[in-house]
Amino acid sequence: MFIEIAGILGAADLRLADTVFAQKDAFESGARTAGRIARAVKNNEQAKPAGLAADLTMLVEKRLMKNDVFRAAARPRNFIRILLSRYTQGMAYGLHSDDAFMERQRVDLSFTLFLSPPESYEGGELIVEEPAGERLVKLEAGSLVLYPSATLHRVAEVTSGERRAAVGWIRSLVRSAEDRETLFDVALALRQAEAAGDRALTDRLLKIQGSLLRRWGED
């Protein structure tokens, strides 16, 4: 399942991001954390995991865990890693899929949380390969795209400006992408039943959701 979620970060959060990205000597080559194959096609910079950058990654995790849509779509067991990345003119990230394991944990989902307004840079689209063709993603600052980590994707070359983002990898409580999508559909139906005040249907859907989580979920 491929899903976009708007408004993960607010104005104050984005101001903190601006402060982090304005720091001198706070960034290093992004190739350091790439897998063996991806390292050859990765050309960006990422923040060193300390100080304000560490504060921002913790804030991103906190905001995501408070977002109902994100939790329903990802069913996160834990965040394996969150990095702050930037691309300036001439930088890009070639076609790749994310590692199956990071830090001895299975990687199920990846996300890109955009931190700079789309009009502030040219190029830099996240390009995802799908059976029907390529999907280009370039969202408003504070908005996120979530997708299975096995997806082939790349970042187009930035031709002007600076593309800023937080990228992260998640181990889900539910291994299968199809099962996560089914649970997401149940969560949407549950929200609709609650909004309609249909207590009987709400209880029935809660039972179904619980049964599916017991069947598909992992401790």
Swiss-Prot record:
Cofactor, free-text remark:
Binds 1 Fe(2+) ion per subunit.
Any idea which positions bind 2-oxoglutarate? R163
Q: Which residues form the Fe2OG dioxygenase domain?
A: 78-172
Q: Name one Pfam family in it.
A: 2OG-FeII_Oxy_3
Q: Where does Fe cation bind?
A: H96, D98, H153
Q: What's its top-level EC category?
A: oxidoreductase
Q: Name the chain's protein.
A: PKHD-type hydroxylase Plav_0037
Instruction: Please give the organism.
Output: Parvibaculum lavamentivorans (strain DS-1 / DSM 13023 / NCIMB 13966)
